[in-house]
Regions:
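S-adenosyl-L-methionine-dependent methyltransferase catalytic core, i.e., the SAM/SAH-binding region
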Residues: 1-195
Length: 195
């Protein structure tokens, strides 16, 4: 199920992470408890993020967490057997997102695309988890990541985009059968409009 090797490099999926020097091992061994909890809550959407962070901080006080095996031994008891695999996937997702700075990169790309597109140009984005999808949906509907609608004098929402599809596009059963990784994919399309 999981690779029990070095914890330092197993979660790094891109070269840019190596330039910043941040590894999953750095995160679990050095981040403050509150920051760890925030990462697990925001990026992994884990309800027990505070407890998870607390257990990690207590464990690392006695010795450094250096392998995935060490890490799993510490956190597995927090999850029930029936949900263990899903919950562990969320933990590793949160660490991967933090290591690779995925949310920051997506945010920068969305704002840059909003500025670069000319009226009539289309922004087409495929997301694979709810955090990404929320950001994309917000920028397409309101023009900002937070989803705060700016209104004109008459109360009309000011947005740089018009949604091309009212509903998000998801893979059908045939696509999922052919490509199981597509099951969580969501495609959103918006067209830049005149201001």
């Amino acid at each position: 199920m999981f690779y029990y090797g070095c914890f330092c490099s197993i979660l790094c999926c891109c070269d840019s992470c190596h330039h910043s020097g941040c590894t999953a091992a750095d995160i679990v061994n050095t981040y403050e408890e509150e920051r760890l909890a925030d990462i697990f809550y925001l990026y992994g959407e884990l309800k027990n993020s505070r407890k998870l962070a607390s257990v990690i901080v207590k464990a690392r006080a006695t010795r450094q967490i250096s392998t995935i095996g060490d890490f799993l031994d510490i956190i597995k008891p927090l999850f029930g057997r029936e949900r263990e695999k899903k919950e562990l996937a969320k933990v590793f997702q949160a660490l991967r997102i933090e290591v690779n700075r995925e949310m920051e990169a997506l945010k920068e790309m969305l704002y840059a695309a909003t500025e670069a597109l000319k009226p009539g140009g289309r922004l087409v984005v495929i997301t694979y988890h709810s955090l990404e999808d929320r950001m994309v949906k917000n920028i397409m509907k309101t023009g900002n990541i937070e989803g705060k609608a700016e209104k004109d004098f008459f109360g009309n929402v000011q947005t740089p985009f018009r949604l091309v599809n009212n509903k998000v596009i998801v893979p059908d059963e045939t696509e999922i059968e052919r490509n199981p990784r597509s099951r969580s994919a969501k495609l959103r399309i918006a067209e830049k409009i005149e201001k």
